[in-house]
Every structure is written in structure tokens, then in C-alpha cells.
């Protein structure tokens, strides 16, 4: 029994001793040594105060409960970035792989003989929006349509005459005979070639 009471007394003394040391350590931590520590502890106690030392904007901020949150400029097939500060950007500048008007089709071939600087650029960059205005696009499309009407289809091949000249360099009557020449790999027969010359 004596050993039991001595173990109990020594454990109580041990706990009492560490209780006093622990309280003094807490008391030392609670009293700040300088004003810098006081500011640090206040920031720790108030989690809503943030360090605004960095000048960059936050990506997501709450403005008000009735105002809209910031709009992000992304999308599926987004091809350009508007650098102007306009809220909406250009009209209809979104979509799945948005491209030029009427620049689609099965087996569509883009010959850039007249426009060598375009280099098959199907997407409209934003670096010069005046160049890509509706008037310029309409002029380009009218010129493109006026040259070879109905020149599309699966397996469409450019027609060259026996003289080696392209289709557009002949007289207008010769072009009218070839106007509706399209289809699945359609070619002229020898009889048709002789009658057209």
C-alpha cells in the first residue's frame, strides 16, 4: 500500500509541476513583446482580414449580393482574346470552333492563289478588327462565289482544259458549260471533252 501511495503522490506532484510550467508558458505567449507581434496576433484572431501586399487583382471577389460575379473569358473553341475593356467583346465571338461565314463543307478546298497572305487562316484574329469587318467579309465572299459557282462536292477536282489553262481563264461561254460540274469524283468523258472544244 505504501508503494501505491508514493506512486500516487509522485504523479500528483509531477502533474502539479507541469501545470505551473505550462501556465507560465501560456502567459508568456499571450503577452506580445512588440507592436509587430500584436499585429500578427490580431491577424490570426480575425481570419477575414487578408494581406493586401500584392498589387495583383484577385480572380474571384464578391462585389455585392445583387451584382453579378466577374465574367471569365473562356469557352469551347475560343480562338482569340479581346484586349479591349469592353464588357461584352465582339458580337457572336463565341461557339464551338467559330470560323468565317460559309467556310465549311465536305471536301471544301481553299485555294489561296488570289490571297497568298491568308495561308488558310480560317479563324479571325482580333489584332485588326477593322480589316475583318462585315463589308470586307462580304466582298471576299462575293468574289469567291462569283468566280466558280457550285465548285464544291465530294471528290471535286479542278478542271483544266487540254491547253493547260485553268478553268477561269477561258471565255465566259466555255465557263457556262462547266458551271454545274460537281459530284462524287465526276469527270468528263472523252465525248464531252471533244464537243466542248
Swiss-Prot record:
Membrane-spanning segments: none
Annotated localization: Secreted
Keyword Metal-binding part of the UniProt annotation: no
Entry keyword Signal: yes
Annotated stretches, region: Disordered: 161-197
Main location: secreted
Propeptide stretch(es), residue numbers: 28-56, 80-86, 188-197
Signal peptide: 1-27
GO biological process: neuropeptide signaling pathway
Top-rank taxon: Eukaryota
Modified residues (Isoleucine amide): 76
Residue positions where Leucine amide is found in the record: 96, 106, 154, 184
Gene Ontology, cellular component aspect: extracellular region
Record key words, sorted: Amidation, Cleavage on pair of basic residues, Neuropeptide, Secreted, Signal
Assigned protein family: Belongs to the allatostatin family.
Record function comment: Neuropeptides.
Protein name: Allatostatins
Native source species: Apis mellifera
Amino acid at each position: 500500500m505504501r508503494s501505491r501511495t508514493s506512486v500516487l503522490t509522485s504523479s500528483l506532484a509531477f502533474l502539479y509541476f507541469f501545470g505551473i510550467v505550462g501556465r507560465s508558458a501560456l502567459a508568456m505567449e499571450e503577452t506580445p513583446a512588440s507592436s509587430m507581434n500584436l499585429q500578427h496576433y490580431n491577424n490570426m484572431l480575425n481570419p477575414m482580414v487578408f494581406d493586401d501586399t500584392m498589387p495583383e487583382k484577385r480572380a474571384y471577389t464578391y462585389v455585392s449580393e445583387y451584382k453579378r460575379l466577374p465574367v471569365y473569358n473562356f469557352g469551347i473553341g475560343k480562338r482569340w482574346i479581346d484586349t479591349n475593356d469592353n464588357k461584352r467583346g465582339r458580337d457572336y465571338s463565341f461557339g464551338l470552333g467559330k470560323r468565317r461565314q460559309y467556310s465549311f463543307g465536305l471536301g471544301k478546298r481553299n485555294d489561296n492563289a488570289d490571297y497568298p497572305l491568308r495561308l488558310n487562316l480560317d479563324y479571325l484574329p482580333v489584332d485588326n478588327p477593322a480589316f475583318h469587318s462585315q463589308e470586307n467579309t462580304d466582298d471576299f465572299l462575293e468574289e469567291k462565289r462569283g468566280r466558280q459557282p457550285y465548285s464544291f462536292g465530294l471528290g471535286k477536282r479542278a478542271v483544266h482544259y487540254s491547253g493547260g489553262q485553268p478553268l477561269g481563264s477561258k471565255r465566259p461561254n466555255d465557263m457556262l458549260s462547266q458551271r454545274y460540274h460537281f459530284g462524287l469524283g465526276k469527270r468528263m468523258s472523252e465525248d464531252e471533252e471533244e464537243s466542248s472544244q
